[in-house]
Amino acid sequence: MHRDAWLPRPAFSLTGLSLFFSLVPPGRSMEVTAPTTLSVLNGSDTRLPCTFNSCYTVNHKQFSLNWTYQECNNCTEEMFLQFRMKIINLKLERFGDRVEFSGNPSKYDVSVTLKNVQLEDEGIYNCYITNPPDRHRGHGKIYLQVLLEVPPERDSTVAVIVGASVGGFLAVVILVLMVVKCVRRKKEQKLSTDDLKTEEEGKMDGEGNAEDGTK
């Protein structure tokens, strides 16, 4: 037999390597936390919160972050801030100098602050996070709604009045029932006492008559 027959064929070797890597457990993916919707008043400053949980500490040499904006779900995303060893503010024309990084990657916080919010800022804000050796990229999505005025608070005066009236009525009813119960109990006790006295007086009269008959 030729000695080369004992050597593994390349195809078998590649198959073995593929099987080996398929058995290696993948890195656990990170979890990103961000509000689904954020309503802010026109002209105010707002913080776009985005935090993440990772099984690994942040290595600034490998960690990366992208913040993007899009007007609608199907619209093109525009990157306005990123982290590559340091924070890089791309200063899009729509935002200018109004975007400020307010997070701390070492504390798993990559939030940004948007100053002097305008109506044109309404839309979708995405934060994309990569933290090797986590293999999967984390994604947080926030829909920013810009309001012209603060929505009016619901008037709860009527509810308070109704609740107080019902509570007062129930208190009066309970008080009346307690008074009636006390009065009835006192009457029952008085009747029991009177019956007991009558019974004792009858016994005493019977004993007196018996003594008179003996004499």
Curated annotation (Swiss-Prot):
Record-linked InterPro entries: Ig-like_dom, Ig-like_dom_sf, Ig-like_fold, Ig_sub, Ig_V-set, Myelin_P0-rel
Domain Ig-like C2-type, residue spans: 32-154
Protein name: Sodium channel regulatory subunit beta-2
Similarity comment: Belongs to the sodium channel auxiliary subunit SCN2B (TC 8.A.17) family.
Source species taxonomy: Eukaryota, Metazoa, Chordata, Craniata, Vertebrata
Cytoplasmic side: 180-215
Gene giving rise to this polypeptide: Scn2b
Signal peptide: 1-29
Assembly with partners or alone: A voltage-gated sodium (Nav) channel consists of an ion-conducting pore-forming alpha subunit functional on its own that is regulated by one or more beta subunits. The beta subunit SCN2B is disulfide-linked to the pore-forming alpha subunit. Interacts with SCN1A; regulatory subunit of SCN1A/Nav1.1. Interacts with SCN2A; regulatory subunit of SCN2A/Nav1.2. Interacts with SCN3A; regulatory subunit of SCN3A/Nav1.3. Interacts with SCN5A; regulatory subunit of SCN5A/Nav1.5. Interacts with SCN8A; regulatory subunit of SCN8A/Nav1.6. Interacts with SCN9A; regulatory subunit of SCN9A/Nav1.7.
Main location as per UniProt: membrane
